[in-house]
Amino acid sequence: MILVLCFILAYFIGAIPFGVVIGKLFYHTDIRKGGSHNIGTTNAYRMLGPVGGSIVLVLDILKGTLAASLPILFGIEHHWLVLIVGLAAVFGHTFSIYIRFKGGKAVATSAGILLAYNPPFFVIAFAIWFSLILLTSMVSVASTLGMVLITAWSLVYHDWLLTTVACGLLVVFLIKHRANFKRIKAGDENMVPFGLGQYLRQHRGRS
């Protein structure tokens, strides 16, 4: 019964659309009505600026961490349940009951699950993700490639549960980023205003 409660609470925690909440409360802006119309961190940066975007990023990570940690908080001593219950938060973020079962791409929320499951691995994954952003200037590419590398890393360490969950999340990322991949192919994917990719695009535009 407690485990069922954990799954339900994890869904409702994961479903909190912090991008929408922060935008409306502090910026009087609905980020769903501009940019990519997504509720996640990238569009929050675009619509709310670096401070608002950073707040959304941290909150989306922490809600994944809190949701995944529910079994531990309720005294269930099976660490592997952190990953399983955490998936309910990903489902909540992707299909949020608060915004008519629409949602984001669950990148930050997935990172929060990893933080609860293996904090050192989270630090490594975050460093990889940020390095890929500096290299490509595209969050979509950094998120997808980062998940591929996390999956490979978990294979090296024979963490089969993490490998399975990472593979599942990779499929979700690929599906949710389909529009991004089409824009990449067309050469007009949105970029962050820094990094090598942005520099090269600007340099080509001047030549």
Curated annotation (Swiss-Prot):
Pathway: Lipid metabolism; phospholipid metabolism. InterPro entries: G3P_acylTferase_PlsY. HAMAP family: PlsY (MF_01043). It is found in: Cell membrane. This is Glycerol-3-phosphate acyltransferase. The lineage of its organism: Bacteria, Bacillati, Bacillota, Bacilli, Lactobacillales. Probably interacts with PlsX. It catalyses: an acyl phosphate + sn-glycerol 3-phosphate = a 1-acyl-sn-glycero-3-phosphate + phosphate. Belongs to the PlsY family. Its EC number is 2.3.1.275. It comes from the Bacteria. Keywords: Cell membrane, Lipid biosynthesis, Lipid metabolism, Membrane, Phospholipid biosynthesis, Phospholipid metabolism, Transferase, Transmembrane, Transmembrane helix. Catalyzes the transfer of an acyl group from acyl-phosphate (acyl-PO(4)) to glycerol-3-phosphate (G3P) to form lysophosphatidic acid (LPA). This enzyme utilizes acyl-phosphate as fatty acyl donor, but not acyl-CoA or acyl-ACP. GO terms for biological process: phospholipid biosynthetic process. PANTHER family: GLYCEROL-3-PHOSPHATE ACYLTRANSFERASE-RELATED, INNER MEMBRANE PROTEIN YGIH. The chain crosses the membrane at residues 2-22, 47-67, 72-92, 121-141, 155-175. GO terms for cellular component: plasma membrane. It comes from Lacticaseibacillus paracasei (strain ATCC 334 / BCRC 17002 / CCUG 31169 / CIP 107868 / KCTC 3260 / NRRL B-441). One of its GO terms (molecular function) is acyl-phosphate glycerol-3-phosphate acyltransferase activity. It is an enzyme of class 2 (transferase). The keyword Protein biosynthesis does not apply. It is a multi-pass membrane protein. The keyword Cell membrane applies.
